[in-house]
Swiss-Prot record:
Cellular localization per UniProt: Cytoplasm
Organism encoding this protein: Shouchella clausii (strain KSM-K16)
Protein name: UPF0291 protein ABC2165
Pfam families from the UniProt entry: DUF896
Signal peptide stretch: none
Predominant localisation class: cytoplasm
Xref: HAMAP family: UPF0291 (MF_01103)
Length: 78
């Protein structure tokens, strides 16, 4: 997400706390927040796919749900 969009989210947030938002501004804020959350979730999921959990003995103890998610992503890429 661009810096301009993040700045606009913050600007709208400040307006909402001080003078309130018009209906158009509220709709813009909601759309920008949804875009931000979508980008955040995607980035977080991509980061999780790089994680491997090991115990003290070096055994892979990555949760099965994460392994399955990694496998599904790999299938979509190939």
């Amino acid at each position: 997400m661009s810096k301009e969009k993040l700045d606009r989210i913050n600007e709208l947030s400040k307006l909402a706390k001080t003078v309130g938002l018009t209906k158009k501004q509220a709709m813009e804020q909601k759309a920008l927040r949804n875009e931000y959350l979508s980008a955040f979730r995607s980035s977080f999921t991509d980061h999780l796919h790089t994680v491997k959990v090991v115990d003290a003995k070096g055994n892979d103890v990555t949760p099965q749900k994460l392994k399955d998610s990694k496998a599904q992503k790999h299938k979509r890429l190939h």
